Every structure is written in C-alpha cells, then in structure tokens.
Amino acid sequence: MTLWQRLSESSHPVALVFFLAFRLGALFTYMFGLLFTDKFVLMFVLVVLLLAADFWNVKNIAGRLMVGLRWWNEASETGESVWVFETADPQRYINPIDSKVFWMMLYGAPVLWVCLAVLALLKFQFLSLILVFIAVSLTVTNAMAYSRCDKFGKANNIVGQVSGGLLSRAARGTFLGRFM
C-alpha cells in the first residue's frame, strides 16, 4: 500500500493535508528556501508565518479533528496562567492513520528543529538560530500541551469508567433492589 493510499484512508483528509502542509512547509522553506532566493528576510518572514499557521492549525483544528484533543491557556482572576484541556467523547472513533501521523509529526518536528538549531550553531548562523528558536518554542509548546492533554483525557476516561461503574452498581443496589 502506498503512502498516498494510506493517507487517503484518513477520516479528515483536508485536516491531514493542511497539518502536513504547514508542518513540512515550514521545515522545507527553512532548509531549501535560500536555494531559490537570496533574500533572507523574505525566508525568515515566510517561515515565521508558516510556523504561526502550523501552531494555530495544530492547536485549534488538527488536534481536535485528528485525535479528539484540544487545549488552550486562560488567565485566572489572580493573574496566573491556567491550562485548559478538552477531550472528545471516549466512544468517538479515532482513525489510526490520523492518530499515527499526528503523533509522529507532533514529536518529530521539534526533534528536527532542534537538529537544525545545532547545525545553525555549528555554522555560526545566528540569525538562522533565532528563527529556529522560534520554531522550537512553538512546536515544543504544542507537543507539551498535547502530551498533557492526552494524559488528562486518559485519566478522565479511567475516572469516568470507575465512577460510572460505581454509580451504576449503587443505583442497581438501591433502586432496583427494592423492586426485586
């Protein structure tokens, strides 16, 4: 089975295409953009725009559609930052193609950007290093938030199953027990 055939089995092919386009677009533009033009500022701006689009898309669309997770950050009345995690219904079907691509790219992209940071440091390309630090911070933030969100969702599912089981047994014992 070819890669294209596997990707076409996605539950959300449009979300998958945009997820891959933004994520890989930023990487390829950074690595190969200067082969097509010598304008570093143009490449810098283009990569930052692709990174911002990728960050927003992963955070708000791709994560929700592909793996049923979403996160955001709120400021409380006291001014402290609060992370909020949202998970889809545990009964919802998560397509294995969507899930594998999402998690591999979510964790793979920061690793690639860190490798590019080391390379930029070794080549003394400090302006490129600034761009790579922006990329690392955005991709690591999404990876960290989705890792927490996934753990939060799994913990809630376990608590829900345990409490649901206890509640159903308690209900059977009190209400149904009277009629039997």
Swiss-Prot record:
The chain crosses the membrane at residues 13-35, 40-58, 101-121, 126-146. Its main location: Golgi. Signal peptide: none annotated. It comes from the Eukaryota. It is a multi-pass membrane protein. GO terms for biological process: protein secretion; vesicle-mediated transport. It holds the Pfam family DUF846. It is found in: Golgi apparatus membrane. One of its GO terms (cellular component) is Golgi membrane. Disulfide bonds: none annotated. Keywords: Golgi apparatus, Membrane, Transmembrane, Transmembrane helix. Belongs to the TVP23 family. Golgi membrane protein involved in vesicular trafficking. This is Golgi apparatus membrane protein TVP23. The gene is TVP23.
